Curated annotation (Swiss-Prot):
This is Somatostatin-1. It comes from the Eukaryota. The gene is sst1. It is found in: Secreted. The keyword rRNA-binding does not apply. It comes from Oncorhynchus kisutch (Coho salmon).
Length: 14
């Protein structure tokens, strides 16, 4: 759970 998730990157800057 984190940047590894494409959906998470959608609204999270890594």
């Amino acid at each position: 759970a984190g940047c590894k998730n494409f959906f998470w990157k959608t609204f999270t800057s890594c």
